[in-house]
């Protein structure tokens, strides 16, 4: 999985929004320590979390499984633009068979699938991938029908935009060891991709 933060709102946008409430602009230090502390105090300590919604982050996420994508979509206050299987399944048409299930073919399958810590599950995922390949390349089934045979482990690619308040909620829930392992990995990757000067707002959300 690869996560890149493509764009983000500067912190001073949030501090200026907060200062609008009290008309305390004269106390600003132009995005310095005072303003950063203000955002944390008002947004995190005093729980006026709506002030954090002024901060927005735009991520590119590569290599997330379709199964994990379903869980990501449950965090509704966010925007997702996802690689279309209807238009991109042609990537499998010219690929050679993934059988037999040997080390070489399993490694080839990793280009398309997220593997887990269970060899039997991974083997069944590769068989599902092979069935999908056969539908596309040998039976010439259209993408919009063949997509129903896609394994949950199939990798996707998306643009993901979320505000700081919603991201805090996501990190709190998905960094827990009760979350799906792939979602735990995503939570860590999103945090790590944040600009360093923003991470202090989210540190208390991480469960491990």
From Swiss-Prot:
Q: Pfam families attached here?
A: Thy1
Residues annotated as the enzyme's active site: 174 (involved in ionization of n3 of dump, leading to its activation)
Chain location of the short sequence motif ThyX motif per the record: 74-84
Belongs to which family? Belongs to the thymidylate synthase ThyX family.
Q: Example GO molecular function term?
A: thymidylate synthase activity
| Binding residues for dUMP | 71-74, 84-86, 147, 174
Q: Domain ThyX, which positions?
A: 1-208
Q: What name has this protein been given in UniProt?
A: Flavin-dependent thymidylate synthase
**Catalysed reactions, semicolon-separated:** dUMP + (6R)-5,10-methylene-5,6,7,8-tetrahydrofolate + NADPH + H(+) = dTMP + (6S)-5,6,7,8-tetrahydrofolate + NADP(+)
What is this protein's function per UniProt?
Catalyzes the reductive methylation of 2'-deoxyuridine-5'-monophosphate (dUMP) to 2'-deoxythymidine-5'-monophosphate (dTMP) while utilizing 5,10-methylenetetrahydrofolate (mTHF) as the methyl donor, and NAD(P)H and FADH(2) as the reductant.
User: Which residues are recorded as binding FAD?
Assistant: 50, 74-76, 163-165, 169
Tell me the PROSITE patterns matching this sequence: THYX
Describe cofactor binding as the record notes it: Binds 4 FAD per tetramer. Each FAD binding site is formed by three monomers.
Name the coenzymes or cofactors required: FAD
Task: State the organism of origin.
Answer: Helicobacter pylori (strain ATCC 700392 / 26695)
Q: What HAMAP family does this protein's entry cite?
A: ThyX
> Tell me, how does this one assemble?
Homotetramer.
């Amino acid at each position: 999985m690869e996560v890149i933060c493509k764009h983000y709102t500067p912190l001073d946008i949030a501090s200026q929004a907060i200062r609008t409430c009290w008309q305390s602009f004269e106390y600003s230090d132009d995005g310095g320590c005072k303003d950063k502390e203000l955002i944390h105090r008002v947004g995190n300590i005093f729980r006026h979390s709506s002030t954090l919604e002024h901060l927005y982050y735009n991520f590119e996420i590569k290599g997330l499984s379709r199964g994990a994508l379903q869980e990501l979509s449950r965090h509704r206050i966010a925007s997702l633009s996802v690689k279309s299987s209807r238009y991109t399944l042609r990537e499998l048409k010219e690929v050679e068979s993934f059988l037999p299930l040997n080390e070489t073919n399993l490694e080839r399958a990793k280009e398309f699938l997220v593997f887990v810590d269970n060899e039997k599950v991974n083997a069944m995922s590769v068989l599902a991938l092979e069935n999908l390949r056969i539908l596309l390349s040998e039976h010439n089934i259209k993408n919009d029908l063949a997509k129903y045979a896609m394994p949950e482990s199939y990798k996707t690619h998306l643009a993901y935009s979320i505000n700081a308040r919603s991201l805090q909620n996501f990190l709190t829930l998905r960094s827990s060891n009760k979350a799906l392992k792939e979602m735990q990995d995503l939570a860590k990757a999103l945090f790590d991709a944040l600009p360093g000067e923003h991470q202090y707002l989210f540190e208390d959300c991480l469960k491990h």
